[in-house]
């Protein structure tokens, strides 16, 4: 698997720690919120020597524009249209309650309307669940698997050394 810039993913994880962030579709409120959170924490994450890699399943141009809007244009990206990498990391399609449960509705109001991330129509598979993985020395060190699309991981907590959460 290669990044959109042509870098080999295996080489990346062997060279430095990687925070691998699997996004949902570009229309997802929580995808936008995740990009905002990553942008806000980026300098601190990178100070740990960690490289951020975003994985998406959407149109390259549309995702590039969205990622640029959050000031993350220089972050490595992997376009995984067939969602093989999602599957390799155990990220599945969400169940109805994970996608449309009370937590998701409440957080859409907060993140989408109050915090300005918007509410948009799905552009790709709306059932795909997101996830975040911290890879260190080529090994999976920590992971955050969303139980709901509305879950909000602490990216800094993931890149700090210590046992898996």
What are these regions (language model features)?
Residues 34-88:
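Structural microenvironment flanking redox-active thiols in thiol-disulfide oxidoreductases
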Residues 9-39, 51:
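Short active-site neighborhood of thiol/selenol oxidoreductases, capturing the structured segment around
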Residues 1-3, 135-136:
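Short, acidic, Ser/Thr-enriched surface-loop or helix-capping motifs
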Residues 67, 73-76, 80-150:
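Thiol/selenol-based redox catalytic cores and closely related redox-interacting motifs
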Residues 3-9:
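A short, well-ordered alpha-helical element
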Residues 150-164:
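A short, polar/charged loop-to-alpha-helix boundary motif
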Residues 6, 15-16, 49, 74, ...:
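A structure-centric signal for secondary-structure junctions around beta-strands
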Residues 23, 56, 136:
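Short beta-strand/turn micro-motifs composed of small residues
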